[in-house]
Amino acid sequence: MPQLLKRLAFQVGSVPNERTTTFTSISNDGHHISLRPLVNLNSTSEEEFPFEWVFAGLNTGVRVVPISEGVVEQDFNFWLDTNCYLNLPNTHRGEVKTIWTQWDSGSVAENGEVFPNGPDNPGVPFFELWHPLDPNRVEQVLLNDPLTTAEATKARSIVFKVREGQGYDGLVIVTGRWAQGFLSKQGDATVDGLNFLRTIELEDGSREALVLYGSDAEKFPQEYLGYESGAHVEVHGLKWDVIESN
């Protein structure tokens, strides 16, 4: 089922915190984007790049293994990753192994370990707490009862992927009213080559951009009605393929 997860807390070390408005979009087929814009900017580097991290992946890059009732292992190899794109020092490379545990409240606890100094050095454990939102609502409504959760499973799920050979990599995932996108210019490796999107469809059918970042952000598709899987769209000279539509 398509999902829109909001992160409630993030912990590395002994003190939990949350400095971002992090949403993760997961399509019906398992493609995913996690967009993590900072709420307050506390340094020059944060002003230059106002995101904790952004990554996106296809369903071929995630492995899900059930552990027990309400517990699964999910191992990720991200296709698009700002840390890798910018070649930031002391950041993890390669597969990220995580354990996800469903809580009675509807929240989901994620536990994992990253290796910012390489796989031969000690890892750094982390904890993230998530809660699914109703993707069909304009407001940020937490899913915590069977009826609204059942309705949320019917949410629209559309995925656009940049066609190869154009000098860009990109993914846009639409879950219900919400859309998130990642677009990067190949061979740039600076913040100038990165573009991000987060929009919400309002009650009157118009779309409001909550995040529209980057000099090429106008190349994101922002109209999502009438597209079937296998369709194509060109936006300001950039061609996108619809790889999923329910």
Curated annotation (Swiss-Prot):
<dbReference type="InterPro" id="IPR043047">
    <property type="entry name" value="Hri1_N_sf"/>
</dbReference>
<dbReference type="GO" id="GO:0005737">
    <property type="term" value="C:cytoplasm"/>
</dbReference>
<keyword id="KW-0539">Nucleus</keyword>
<dbReference type="InterPro" id="IPR038744">
    <property type="entry name" value="Hri1_N"/>
</dbReference>
<dbReference type="GO" id="GO:0005634">
    <property type="term" value="C:nucleus"/>
</dbReference>
<dbReference type="Pfam" id="PF16815">
    <property type="entry name" value="HRI1"/>
</dbReference>
<comment type="similarity">
    <text>Belongs to the HRI1 family.</text>
</comment>
<protein>
    <recommendedName>
        <fullName>Protein HRI1</fullName>
    </recommendedName>
</protein>
<keyword id="KW-0963">Cytoplasm</keyword>
<dbReference type="InterPro" id="IPR031818">
    <property type="entry name" value="Hri1"/>
</dbReference>
